Curated annotation (Swiss-Prot):
The lineage of its organism: Eukaryota, Viridiplantae, Streptophyta, Embryophyta, Tracheophyta. It catalyses: 1D-myo-inositol 3,4,5,6-tetrakisphosphate + ATP = 1D-myo-inositol 1,3,4,5,6-pentakisphosphate + ADP + H(+); 1D-myo-inositol 1,3,4-trisphosphate + ATP = 1D-myo-inositol 1,3,4,5-tetrakisphosphate + ADP + H(+); 1D-myo-inositol 1,3,4-trisphosphate + ATP = 1D-myo-inositol 1,3,4,6-tetrakisphosphate + ADP + H(+). This is Inositol-tetrakisphosphate 1-kinase 1. Kinase that can phosphorylate various inositol polyphosphate such as Ins(3,4,5,6)P4 or Ins(1,3,4)P3. Phosphorylates Ins(3,4,5,6)P4 at position 1 to form Ins(1,3,4,5,6)P5. This reaction is thought to have regulatory importance, since Ins(3,4,5,6)P4 is an inhibitor of plasma membrane Ca(2+)-activated Cl(-) channels, while Ins(1,3,4,5,6)P5 is not. Also phosphorylates Ins(1,3,4)P3 on O-5 and O-6 to form Ins(1,3,4,6)P4, an essential molecule in the hexakisphosphate (InsP6) pathway. Its EC number is 2.7.1.134, 2.7.1.159. It comes from Arabidopsis thaliana.
Length: 319
């Protein structure tokens, strides 16, 4: 059916320049166009009510004016999906409220697969870090992460802390999370509405009891990534053959988990990082949740996103 007679839908996007460059690829534009969906760039400084007859809005902007703009649009056009609502997104900007999502899930208990989150404590006072009580019941080594998870460079600055000496580099507020050996593999689960895809990535290598006893201080994650094989620097996304033999978590388990998370958070676009406990192959831990991740890195992202857009503009299903 030609574009001239096919019913067409308008999906507006409001993204930061870097995000727009990585996400709005020509291949995605063409995939969507062939399905009858036109992707149009929105001007966040102007009223959304003056930018055409929109059938759906996707966004990843957080300033106050944009939130007010969205609020006005939602009041005047309540039937148009806004993906996603700012108040729902904000929950993921704090690493405590982020993982509380998981602990509060109502999810059927399975004998074969169990899930949870690593033990963690929050330190709000930097003076506590220099003492010996910051860890609570945790034991070294621990992972130190900034409390804020707003996507800034600062929020990605993490450390593996081996001992009390390593704590000196940290500043509050910060989250201290137990380190769980997981075979050096992380599973990144991409959620796009009802669509779920999982990929394997290299992660922090396991730490032996011997190494725990001899390692000192701290290591930033950028250095830890260099501890794995030399050839890692030449490995592109999805091309690490050393991971081929690593078994994926059951897709049915991940799909059910993603659905429960989606409904609990009220979000359609996110990914979550999962590790498998090296001591218990049926125990999975969710360690991070990100809103509107780098979907262009996901294999075959164009048809997945196009199908999601179609679901949204035809009002099939969104939270």
């Amino acid at each position: 059916m030609s574009d001239s007679i096919q019913e067409r839908y308008l999906v507006g996007y409001a993204l930061a320049a870097k995000k727009q460059h990585s996400f709005i690829q020509p291949s995605l534009i063409e995939h969507s166009r062939q399905r009858g969906i036109d992707l149009v760039k929105l001007d966040p400084t102007k009223s959304l009510l003056e930018q055409g007859k929109l059938d759906c809005i996707i966004h990843k902007l957080y300033d106050v004016y944009w939130k007010e703009n969205l609020h006005e649009f939602r009041e005047k056009c309540p039937g148009v999906p806004v993906i996603d609502l700012p108040e729902a997104i904000e929950r993921l900007h704090n690493r405590v409220s982020m993982l509380e999502v998981i602990t509060q899930l109502r999810f059927p208990v399975s004998d074969s697969e169990r899930f949870g989150v690593p033990e963690q404590v929050v330190v709000m006072d930097s003076s506590v870090l220099s003492g010996g009580g910051a860890l609570g019941e945790l034991k070294f080594p621990v992972i130190a992460k900034p409390l804020d998870a707003d996507g800034s460079a600062k929020s990605h600055k993490m450390f593996l802390i081996y001992d009390q000496e390593g704590m000196k580099i940290l500043k509050a507020p910060i989250v201290l999370q137990e380190f769980v050996n997981h075979g050096g593999v992380i599973f990144k689960v991409y959620v796009v509405g009802d669509h779920v895809k999982c990929v394997k990535r290299r992660s922090l290598p396991d730490i032996s009891e011997e190494k725990i006893g001899t390692s000192k201080g701290s290591l930033p994650f950028s250095q830890i990534s260099n501890l794995t094989a030399q050839e890692d620097k030449n490995i592109e996304y999805g091309e690490d053959r050393s991971l081929e033999k690593v078994e994926m978590p059951p897709l049915s388990f991940l799909t059910d988990l993603a659905k429960a998370m989606r409904e609990s958070m009220g979000l359609n676009l996110f990914n979550f990082d999962v590790i498998r406990d090296a001591k218990d192959a049926n125990r999975y831990l969710i360690i991070d949740i990100n809103y509107f991740p780098g979907y262009a890195k996901m294999p075959s992202y164009e048809p997945v996103l196009t199908e999601f857009f179609w679901d949204m503009v035809t009002k099939k299903n969104h939270v």
